[in-house]
Amino acid sequence: MQENTRLRIAIQKSGRLSKESIELLSECGVKMHIHEQSLIAFSTNLPIDILRVRDDDIPGLIFDGVVDLGIIGENVLEENELERQSLGENPSYKLLKKLDFGYCRLSLALPQEKKFQNLKDFEGLRIATSYPQLLKRFMKENGINYKNCMLTGSVEVAPRANLADAICDLVSSGATLQANNLKEVKVIYESRACLIQKENALSKEKQTLVDKIMLRVAGVMQARESKYIMLHAPKEKLDKIQALLPGVERPTILPLAHDEKNVALHMVSKENLFWETMEALKEEGASSILVLPIEKMLK
């Protein structure tokens, strides 16, 4: 098959989105062999090439039409879009789907000993960040004047090194901030991974493949957030038992062999079934309660 007929997907080579991007593609049926030092992987069962690059490069590859699809954090995508716009360009792309991983937030943080009342406390401060465009937009919207200190890494050490008075950096758990004697005071941007497509139209063959992948991505995400529940229930308690089950679609009710008083319920729940709910089900007479993960799902 000619190279230009193969779908090109850019993902992060290393970092917080890399592993989960590969897992998502694998769960969508894309078979590939990833070698640690290799920058490109070829699918063995679909006409797909996986480009493993720096996350900062993925938006540009999409904007310029070099690759067809990309998995990228919204924070990196928007930072790069704002950067291009600041240069007078008009970058474009198609947002196909927000994904269920890579959650983080871009936040302002101060040294623990500094008091914080409101955003005016940042007036005139020197703020270290790797996201100058997102910070600039937020501060402009809130009428705050500040001094920018651009760093490409280790932003959290800037106050301790007297490079800045505060920072604007990504936060997941907050452990890194705490380890550097910093406190998160204001979230300025919420982010997660997303799947994007270049703006230019794809060939019919590529678009058909993208549509197939999107159907599978939706199925994988639905399966991840769903559980398959099986239990036995007294016929006389069916209404009460169904009312206890969170996010359940219409259940399948099956007769039990040699048992006239009970039935089997099979159902898909879009919410986790906690121990408290299982105990409440048991109190209403349910038994043999099984909660199972779902590997794949298509509606």
UniProtKB/Swiss-Prot annotation:
Pfam family, one: HisG_C
Keyword Magnesium: yes
Location in or out of the cell: Cytoplasm
Record keywords, A-Z: Amino-acid biosynthesis, ATP-binding, Cytoplasm, Glycosyltransferase, Histidine biosynthesis, Magnesium, Metal-binding, Nucleotide-binding, Transferase
InterPro entries listed in its UniProt record: ATP-PRT_HisG_long (IPR020621), ATP_PRibTrfase_cat (IPR013820), ATP_PRibTrfase_CS (IPR018198), ATP_PRibTrfase_HisG (IPR001348), HisG_C (IPR013115), N-reg_PII-like_a/b (IPR011322), N-reg_PII/ATP_PRibTrfase_C (IPR015867)
Family: Belongs to the ATP phosphoribosyltransferase family. Long subfamily.
HAMAP family: HisG_Long (MF_00079)
Name this protein carries in UniProt: ATP phosphoribosyltransferase
Annotated source species: Campylobacter jejuni subsp. jejuni serotype O:23/36 (strain 81-176)
